[in-house]
Amino acid sequence: VFERALFYDRRDRPPFFDLDGFPLQRIELSPGNLEDAVAASGAIPLVLAGVRGIEGTARGVYRDGGIIDYHLDLPHSADEKFTLYPHFFGHIVPGWFDKKLKNRRPQPHHIDRTILISPSDEFVARLPHGKIPDRRDFANFEPAERVRAWKQCIAACDQLADEFLEVVEKEQLAARLEPL
């Protein structure tokens, strides 16, 4: 039996905290479980091992939410708050199975207080193979080529992070915002 796990910060519960469409275990983030919770959120089934023994959780294996949790068309923010959403792409497609449907978009009132941070198309085009590394790289490239490309992308992303910090420190973020 699968059960969802929502790790949350008690100071700021997400607007979807009380959803009940699937069995849901709610776990408060703490210094003792933060690292394991982040590791579990990236543990892609059949690719990376799940995480066991996370402090404050029921027994079991914790891993990436997969099909039911990718880009749900739900409100991202409470009315008076904003959500900062780092993402690979400059758009959000609700529904994991619909990600190839380029015209599918979330309901506007679900993302009207979302600040999406993503690399530009020009940045991605300059990366090795003109794309962001993904799990298909394991099948498409030999290990040495895959590692080389991933390291180049990490270096490029370090520069991107430095640029973002500079924009924030100089209070230039508002000038860079575009409507979703």
List each model region and its residues:
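Patatin-like phospholipase
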Residues: V1-L180
